[in-house]
Amino acid sequence: MADVTVGIVVFPGSNCDHDTEYAVASFPGVKPVMLWHNDHDLKGCDAVILPGGFSYGDYLRCGAIARFSPIMREVIDFAGKGRPVLGICNGFQVLVECGLLEGALIRNAGRRFVSRQTTISVANNATIFTDRYQKGEVLRVPVAHGEGNYYASPETIESLESNGQVVFRYTDAWGNATAEANFNGSMNNIAGIVNKQGNVLGLMPHPERASEKLLGSEDGRRLFESLFAHLAGA
């Protein structure tokens, strides 16, 4: 794989930045670069990841303050040029707050923070983030959030579905999008979406926490592999 540089944005309150750094660095030829929230430069990165955590303490709303960070102006411009941006958990929340992705992430239906292993299925494998998966493949990936309930207008949901922008869904172990599997109440069991251009992905589950056998699952690793292979032209 050709050399690839991946920026990982660190906000005050981020707590998955080093987990993400570890997962990224495990790929030969891929170099993680930490980007501070006050930076005005993406340092020549080929892709940007917004990691999980509680940016700015989740005051006002999850991701509501982080969207105004200086670094986000650069990320928005970067995404506008068609460059890859990945938002994980709190990173997904930041992406919807700044308008790079549609919809909103609201309080879980059960009104509780949920931290556990979950199963999701690949709804669309024709993206730069998922082409190493099979469509319909079921993955074991952990979640840890209190506001991961994906919500959007009926028109937006219809558009996301018809355009193939729903990338991951909460399902049971057999790939069925049941009410029981939809622990946070997300519309249409949505766990992750991509923008119309296909270069910005947000998901609530944590692929970096499912990147090696020691963690109980390697199912998240191929998301990174898909992205890095795309960047390297492999």
UniProtKB/Swiss-Prot annotation:
This is Phosphoribosylformylglycinamidine synthase subunit PurQ. Keywords: ATP-binding, Cytoplasm, Glutamine amidotransferase, Hydrolase, Ligase, Nucleotide-binding, Purine biosynthesis. The lineage of its organism: Bacteria, Pseudomonadati, Chlorobiota, Chlorobiia, Chlorobiales. The active site is at residues 89, 206, 208. It catalyses: N(2)-formyl-N(1)-(5-phospho-beta-D-ribosyl)glycinamide + L-glutamine + ATP + H2O = 2-formamido-N(1)-(5-O-phospho-beta-D-ribosyl)acetamidine + L-glutamate + ADP + phosphate + H(+); L-glutamine + H2O = L-glutamate + NH4(+). Its main location: cytoplasm. GO terms for biological process: 'de novo' IMP biosynthetic process. Its EC number is 6.3.5.3, 3.5.1.2. GO terms for cellular component: cytoplasm. SMART domains: GATase_5.
